[in-house]
C-alpha cells in the first residue's frame, strides 16, 4: 500500500477484493482500503476487474453526504487500491442485531438518508442497481451512505438495453424478474421499499429462492398485477402467468404497527407499473416525512453494541430545542 496509509487490520474479503482498515498518516483519519483482486482475462480490462473501473469512474464524478466517498486511487502495475471513507457498520448488521430496537424516528431517518443519496444519483442519471441492507453503510455519527457501485450504470440513452440480471434477488423489481432489458429509476425505488419493510419486520419481506418463487412471494403479499394495472407486463421477455398462493391482504395486515402514511409510501414504491412507481423526489414529498414523529438526530441512530460510539452531548438549536432532520416543503 501507499506509504501514506498505515494498515491496521483486515476487515473482510469479497469476490473481487480484500478490505483493510488503515490510517491516513496525513490527516490522522481512519479509512477503508479496498484492494482489488486481479480479474480473469474474460472479466478484466488491462488486468483490472471491470467492476472496479466502473466504480472508480462513477465515484470520481459524484459527491454527496449519503454516498460513500472515494478519497484516493492507488495504482501499481496490475493491482489497484481504492481508498474510501471508513464506516463503522452496515444496515444489515443493525437489522440483525436483536438488542437494537428500531423506533419510528430511527426508521424515518434511515429512509430519508437512503432517498436523499439515491435522489442525487438519479438526478445525475445513475442507477445503483444493487440496493440492499449491506450496501448501506453507517458510521458512528449516524450518517448512512450508499456503497458498492460495481453494478451502477448511467441511464437515459434512447433505446439502450441493459442486463436484467442485476440487483440481489430479494430486492429485485418485478420487471427485472420478467426479463426487462429497458428500465429506469423504478428498479432502485422498489429495492428501497423492500429495505423499509425489512427495517419494520427485521427479516426480508420477499425471500425468494428462484426468480419464479420471488414473483410468487411478491404477488402473495401485493396481489397479482393485471393488464389494466401494468399494461406492458405481458410483452416482457420472460413473462409467465403466476397465480398467488394466498388470499390478498392489505399491507396493514403484514405491518400492523406501521402508520398509514408509511404504508402509502411503501405502496407507491411497490407499484407494479414502473412508469407509475414513485420517484425519490416524489417519495421525499410524501406525507410520511411531514408528520410526527420526525426523524431522530443522525447520531441517535442505534449501532451494534460492539461498535457503539461513546455518548455525545446533544446539540441544541438557537431556541434551546433539539434539532430534527426535516425536509423543507416551502
Curated annotation (Swiss-Prot):
- Give the family, as the similarity comment puts it: Belongs to the protein kinase superfamily. CMGC Ser/Thr protein kinase family. CDC2/CDKX subfamily.
State the organism of origin.
Caenorhabditis elegans
Q: Where is this region: Disordered?
A: 305-330
Record has Secreted as a keyword: no
The name on file for this protein is Cyclin-dependent kinase 7
Reactions that this protein is recorded to catalyse: L-seryl-[protein] + ATP = O-phospho-L-seryl-[protein] + ADP + H(+); L-threonyl-[protein] + ATP = O-phospho-L-threonyl-[protein] + ADP + H(+); [DNA-directed RNA polymerase] + ATP = phospho-[DNA-directed RNA polymerase] + ADP + H(+)
Gene inactivation phenotype reads: RNAi-mediated knockdown results in an arrest at approximately 50-cell embryonic stage. The phenotype is more severe when done in a cdk7(ax224) mutant background where the embryonic arrest occurs at the 1-cell stage due to an arrest in early meiosis.
Where Phosphothreonine occurs, the residues are 163
Quote the gene name from the UniProt entry: cdk-7
In this record, what's one Pfam family? Answer: Pkinase
Q: Which UniProt keywords apply?
A: ATP-binding, Cell cycle, Cell division, Kinase, Nucleotide-binding, Phosphoprotein, Serine/threonine-protein kinase, Transcription, Transcription regulation, Transferase
Recorded GO MF terms: ATP binding; cyclin-dependent protein serine/threonine kinase activity; protein serine kinase activity; RNA polymerase II CTD heptapeptide repeat kinase activity
PROSITE patterns in the cross-refs: PROTEIN_KINASE_ATP, PROTEIN_KINASE_DOM, PROTEIN_KINASE_ST
Q: State the InterPro entries in the record.
A: CDK, CDK7, Kinase-like_dom_sf, Prot_kinase_dom, Protein_kinase_ATP_BS, Ser/Thr_kinase_AS
Assembly: Catalytic component which, in association with cyclin H (cyh-1) and mat1, is likely to form the CAK complex.
One Gene Ontology biological process? regulation of cell cycle
Free-text function comment from the UniProt entry: Serine/threonine kinase involved in cell cycle control and in RNA polymerase II-mediated RNA transcription. Required for maintaining chromosome ploidy. May phosphorylate the large subunit of RNA polymerase II, ama-1.
EC number, as in UniProt: 2.7.11.22, 2.7.11.23
Q: Coiled-coil segments, which residues?
A: none
**The keyword Repressor is assigned to this record:** no
Q: Which SUPFAM superfamilies match?
A: Protein kinase-like (PK-like)
Amino acid at each position: 500500500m501507499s506509504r501514506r496509509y498505515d494498515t491496521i487490520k483486515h476487515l473482510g474479503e469479497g469476490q473481487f477484493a480484500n478490505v483493510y482498515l488503515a490510517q491516513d498518516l496525513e490527516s490522522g483519519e481512519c479509512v477503508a482500503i479496498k484492494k482489488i483482486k486481479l480479474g480473469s482475462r474474460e472479466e478484466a480490462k488491462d488486468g483490472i476487474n471491470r467492476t472496479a473501473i466502473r466504480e472508480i469512474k462513477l465515484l470520481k464524478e459524484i459527491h454527496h453526504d449519503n454516498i460513500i466517498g472515494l478519497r484516493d486511487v492507488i495504482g501499481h502495475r496490475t493491482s489497484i487500491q481504492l481508498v474510501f471513507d471508513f464506516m463503522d457498520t452496515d444496515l444489515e448488521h443493525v437489522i440483525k442485531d436483536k438488542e437494537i430496537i428500531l423506533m419510528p424516528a430511527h426508521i424515518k431517518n434511515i429512509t430519508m438518508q437512503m432517498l436523499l443519496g439515491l435522489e442525487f444519483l438519479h438526478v445525475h442519471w445513475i442507477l445503483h442497481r444493487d440496493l440492499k441492507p449491506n450496501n448501506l453503510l453507517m458510521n458512528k455519527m449516524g450518517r448512512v451512505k450508499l456503497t458498492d457501485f460495481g453494478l451502477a450504470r448511467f441511464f437515459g440513452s434512447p433505446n439502450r438495453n441493459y442486463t436484467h440480471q442485476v440487483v440481489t434477488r430479494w430486492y429485485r423489481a418485478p420487471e427485472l424478474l420478467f426479463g426487462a432489458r429497458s428500465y429506469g429509476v423504478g428498479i432502485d425505488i422498489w429495492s428501497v421499499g423492500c429495505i423499509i419493510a425489512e427495517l419494520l419486520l427485521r427479516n426480508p419481506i420477499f425471500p425468494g429462492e428462484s426468480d419464479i418463487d420471488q414473483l410468487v412471494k411478491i404477488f402473495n403479499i401485493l396481489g397479482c398485477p393485471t393488464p389494466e394495472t401494468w399494461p406492458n407486463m405481458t410483452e416482457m421477455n420472460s413473462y409467465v402467468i403466476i397465480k398467488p398462493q394466498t388470499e390478498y391482504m392489505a399491507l396493514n395486515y403484514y405491518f400492523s404497527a406501521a402508520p398509514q402514511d408509511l404504508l402509502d409510501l411503501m405502496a407507491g414504491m411497490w407499484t407494479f407499473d414502473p412508469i407509475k412507481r414513485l420517484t425519490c423526489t416524489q417519495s421525499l414529498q410524501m406525507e410520511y416525512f411531514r408528520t410526527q414523529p420526525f426523524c431522530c438526530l443522525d447520531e441517535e441512530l442505534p449501532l451494534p453494541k460492539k461498535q457503539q460510539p461513546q455518548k455525545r452531548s446533544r446539540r441544541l438549536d438557537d431556541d434551546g430545542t433539539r434539532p430534527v432532520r426535516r425536509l423543507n416543503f416551502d
